[in-house]
A protein has these predicted regions:
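Core catalytic lobe of class I
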Residues: 1-162
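S-adenosyl-L-methionine
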Residues: 165-188
């Protein structure tokens, strides 16, 4: 934890304290019509977050009638449409400590899977390709596979790449119908 965020700093000299920096999700859209709509005909089915879904809404999950009445999907959408995602589970991340080297930056931490799950359901269709140009330990590719998408990741650091391969194999085992992701990879 950063020293300026520690309670001890407040006790010793609060002029040195600070507040935590927020994470930001930047969304870029290409102008024009989307030729392949991302549809949810029975609403949003799964919630990625820490809040408990109210029990009375569960009967609406997968509701096939008018989506105006789908209170389950509406509840999930209100969480996702919020300007602040304060319900993201900070500890829901892939293993990463084994990939760290001594000379790594101190800020290295994988993206939370709740954020990835939300992005995948909102901005991609099952079966589509998801690209992550900074793969790290493979969180986005892992999430893509679990969500029924194909993931393409680029990583320069060998220790991160090796951890990503392990993490992605776990996603593959969770989704055996996806086929062998590494059938053509020479691991030597």
């Amino acid at each position: 934890m950063a020293k300026n965020l520690a309670h001890k700093t407040i006790v010793d000299d609060s002029s040195r304290c600070s507040c935590a920096s927020a994470d930001y999700l930047l969304i870029f859209r290409k102008h024009g019509e989307n030729p392949v709509p991302i549809e949810h005909p029975v609403g949003l089915l799964d919630y990625a977050g820490s809040r408990e879904i109210p029990g009375e809404l569960l009967k609406y999950r997968g509701y096939e009638g008018s989506q105006i009445k789908n209170r389950y999907s509406h509840w999930i959408w209100r969480q996702y449409a919020s300007a602040f995602w304060d319900d993201v589970r900070l500890n829901r991340v892939l293993p990463f400590k084994a990939a760290r080297d001594e000379e790594d930056e101190k800020h290295v931490h994988p993206l939370q899977l709740d954020v990835i799950d939300r992005c995948l359901v909102l901005w991609s269709n099952p079966g589509e390709n998801v690209l992550t140009p900074f793969m790290g330990v493979g969180s986005e590719v892992y999430g893509a596979i679990v969500a029924g998408r194909r993931g393409v990741g680029i990583e320069l650091k060998e220790s991160y790449y090796n951890q990503a391969v392990q993490n992605i194999h776990e996603a593959h085992e969770a989704k055996p119908e996806q086929g062998d992701l590494f059938a053509d990879v020479d691991e030597s």
